[in-house]
């Protein structure tokens, strides 16, 4: 099954079941036979929280989760959701002959779904979601003629083929939710013709086959994360009713049919992660009720559809994601008329021209991602009108000009990524006011000047990259002052003097891998943004931006002198350290002091003395480069060198002793360099290649020593 890389969409809409008969103020006594069945059930299960300790006596009012019929006392409804109950289901439940609603969701029940459930002939609602049931749908379900809702979602080992009779056994069936299970095969044809069906959710299974048109007025259709193929049907029968259509992460191909414009009630359309291509027809006019449109990760080409804004003025589009396609041309000015827009993602296309100057008219905008295009011009000053902005990502374009001091008006900003452009000038001091910043990437530009201590006001900073610019001056004493920092990349600049050790004793690069120790449970560089869509109160947009990288420091390719601060090797959570291509002196600290170290590059410096201890001591060490220094003495392969061929090349006074070659202490020469010369990947790029090999599959590429692949996902949930 195709795995979700970037965006995942979950829809939870409940179709209200018919009201059960209400008990009168004087509740009846529980039917003796039903009482006996329930007591047997209670004894058979594990009730760790003693949630069913109220099950005693004769009055229905005392029994947790029960609703009884007046005057018979027969059990009509049993709701035991979220009580942490476990064990297999005892067949005594099947003796509740009048039961109309059974909800055992959010527990730890296991085993097969009891086949005796088929004897509950009055059952209208069955919810067994979020348990550990296995096997397949019992054939006895064919007897449940009154069933209106069946929810079996999130039972990962429940599956098999959906029975061919499933759409025929109950003419009243309105809601079917088999999401996040293991169902396989094609959709049974009977489901396509079940006239009463309004909600069908089969997300995250392994279902196959082509999609055919449904013949009923569906309201919600969610077939995401399966293996459906073929082209997209028109859903003619659902034109007056279909509100949510999610077929993301399948293998659909072809163009986007113009008939989608006839779905006048459509509010959520997600066709991301498929194989759609061609241009989007200019005749296609989306529903004026559209709130969310996600066509990302396809092969669409041509110009961006401009008619979206002509039909979305009443309620307004909240999310527009057309990223990862082949759209070209300018960004249409009409997009700046989508007044309710909160997330705009047009990244990874072929867009040209300027960022629209009127983008600041989108005052509700919280996420802008225009990265990986060919946009030109400067960052429009009008963008400060997006005063609710949380993420501004415009990296990998051809933008120029300077960083506007007025950007300090975006005081809610958490993510600022303008890397890989042609932006020049200095960092405005006014940006120190952006105290919510967590990720700042301004690498690979033409920025210059000295760094000002004012940026230490970014107290929430997790990731800071100034790499590949023209910054100069001494490294500031406050370099390690950020309390929450995980990654610092100042590589390929013109910084000089010493590596400061101020604040190193108080800084503890956080342990984000296990969630234990002194760190936090969240992964490194993760920023979560939750957006409430005011236009539809039930919607919540969760935008997550991950720097899938490790904890580390990169100060390579600068003009640094002096010794490596001892305190730097006391940062026990550091995984990557790159100080190569500088003028550092002194001895190599013991690597045992960095137990989590995975990559270390100290090459092309002037480090000296003997290499003491086992250089492969950190168990996770994968890359080591100590070449082109001034180390001396004798080292054997037993001390860990065999794991890193070429790691000590270019140290003429160092002799590496192998089983076939012994060192003469009186005659150490430079022959070792020739032995390893062809095995060494030289320069700072060596550690980058390591990172690239580990993380090349991630969405946004690699950022320096930290292997910073960027992934993002956002979830638009429709809650009951």
From Swiss-Prot:
GO terms for cellular component: endoplasmic reticulum membrane; membrane; plasma membrane. Disruption phenotype: Insensitivity to root growth regulation by root CLE peptides (e.g. CLE8, CLE9/CLE10, CLE11, CLE13, CLE14, CLE16, CLE17, CLE18, CLE20, CLE21, CLE25, CLE26, CLE40, CLE41/CLE44 and CLE45). Impaired interaction with CRN. Stem cell proliferation leading to enlarged shoot and flower meristems, as well as alterations in the development of the gynoecia, flower pedicels, and stamens. Reduced sensitivity to CLV3, CLE19 and CLE40 peptides. Ectopic fruit organ initiation after floral meristem termination. Enhanced resistance to nematode infection. Disulfide bonds join 60-68. LRR repeats lie at residues 96-122, 124-144, 146-168, 170-194, 195-217, 219-238, 239-263, 264-287, 288-311, 314-338, 339-362, 364-386, 388-410, 411-436, 438-458, 459-482, 484-506, 547-571, 573-594, 595-617, 619-641. Residues 708-720 are cytoplasmic. Mostly expressed in apices (e.g. shoot apical meristem and flower buds), and, to a lower extent, in flowers, leaves, seedlings and siliques. Also expressed in the inner tissues of the proximal root meristem. Expressed throughout the vascular cylinder of root tips. One of its GO terms (molecular function) is peptide receptor activity. It is found in: Cell membrane; Endoplasmic reticulum membrane. Changing residue 572 to R: In strain: cv. Landsberg erecta. InterPro entries: Leu-rich_rpt (IPR001611), Leu-rich_rpt_typical-subtyp (IPR003591), LRR_dom_sf (IPR032675), RLP23-like (IPR046956). Changing residue 87 to G: In strain: cv. An-2, cv. Bla-1, cv. Bs-1, cv. Bu-0, cv. Chi-1, cv. Co-1, cv. Cvi-0, cv. El-0, cv. Gr-3, cv. Ita-0, cv. Jl-3, cv. Kas-1, cv. Landsberg erecta, cv. Lisse-2, cv. Lu-1, cv. Pi-0, cv. Sf-1, cv. Wassilewskija. Changing residue 264 to T: In strain: cv. Ita-0. Residues 26-92 are annotated as: N-cap. This is Receptor-like protein CLAVATA2. The gene is CLV2.
